[in-house]
Design a protein with these regions (language model features):
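Non-catalytic beta-strand/loop surface segments
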Residues: 1-39, 65-98, 135-189, 213-258
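Short pre-active-site segment immediately N-terminal to the catalytic Zn-binding motif
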Residues: 38-46
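Active-site SXXK
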Residues: 47-61
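Bacterial peptidoglycan biogenesis and beta-lactam-recognition machinery
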Residues: 58-62, 112-119, 199-201, 211-217
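M16/insulysin-pitrilysin zinc metalloprotease superfamily fold
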Residues: 60-63, 94-125, 259
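Acidic/histidine-enriched alpha-helical segments
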Residues: 115-133, 199, 218-232
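Non-catalytic accessory/assembly modules
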Residues: 119-123, 139-147, 198, 205
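Non-catalytic, conformational "gating/processing" segments within enzyme and secreted inhibitor domains
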Residues: 125-126, 175-210
């Protein structure tokens, strides 16, 4: 059965896009902030910075101590997390609808007041390196995924994994992180999505209160290299110690906005 959503949209003067869906079936909400940046926006030398930065977003701001963001959400009956993809980075809180303002306040705060320090970078760098070892270097499925994408794409940024290459994770600098923050973590590069037990007009007022004063940034006019048209089969064989063979096959298809994609 198809789920029908009655979506309402509001645009702040600073470019922030707000999407709402009102649903009073339970006294809970899901609050999400999606930034239009992922590993696709990286370049050789700083691959993995989008995912590394996701980790650093939990390490405190001018007004919130390290890890306090998650503690405050949990103390008020909620959960929070984040994820990075090739195209987007998202942060979310699921919590009682009475605590909507808390989630809005915390997310707005770290959009503009994040504290980036050498100690934080050093700490999270090691966490991400260990994550990479676990999910890719010591994982057959991880090796297969890396081999698949690096073979299917030779020019487009999809060719590297979201977590990045280990050599780049090792050398990403604090200045790289600060430049990344200034460039992408800005209201005119973000979409706020709020679902659940809300009053749309009151919700707009709360979002305007905390996000409305944040100044937009001038977004870079990025040119993503286009992949050459593939005219024949590409193949990569990986030889590893395993009990049975693994196989992965990928096909290039048009982008999601193409008329050839059924909707």
């Amino acid at each position: 059965e198809q789920i029908k959503l009655d979506l309402k949209e509001h645009r702040l003067k600073n470019g922030l896009r707000l999407i709402m869906n009102e649903d009073h079936s339970s006294p809970i909400i899901s609050f999400q902030v999606w930034y239009d940046v992922g590993s696709m926006n990286e370049r050789p030398g700083i691959t993995g910075i989008s995912h590394l930065f996701e980790h650093m977003m939990f390490k405190g701001s001018k007004n919130v101590e390290p890890e306090e963001h998650s503690r405050m959400i949990q103390q008020n009956g909620g959960t929070d997390n984040a994820f990075t993809t090739k195209d987007m980075t998202a942060y979310f809180e699921n919590l009682p609808s009475s605590q909507l303002e808390l989630a809005v306040k915390l997310e707005a705060d770290r959009m503009v007041h994040l504290q980036l320090t050498a100690d934080t970078l050093s700490s999270e760098r090691e966490v991400v390196k260990e994550e990479r070892r676990l999910r890719y270097d010591n994982s057959l499925s991880g090796k297969l995924s890396e081999g698949l994408y690096s073979t299917a794409f030779t020019r487009h940024p999809y060719r590297w994994p979201v977590i990045g290459w280990m050599s780049d994770i090792d050398t990403i600098s604090l200045e790289d992180c600060k430049a990344f923050y200034r460039s992408y973590y800005t209201p005119n590069n973000a979409t706020v999505i709020i679902l659940g037990d809300i009053d749309p007009q009151k919700t707009i007022s709360i979002v305007e209160k905390y996000f409305g004063h944040i100044q937009p940034a001038e977004l870079m006019d990025e040119v993503i290299p286009e992949e050459d048209i593939q005219k024949q089969e590409k193949r990569k064989d990986l030889y590893v110690d395993t009990q049975f063979p693994w196989l992965a096959i990928a096909y290039h298809i048009p982008e999601a906005a193409s008329d050839d994609i059924p909707v």
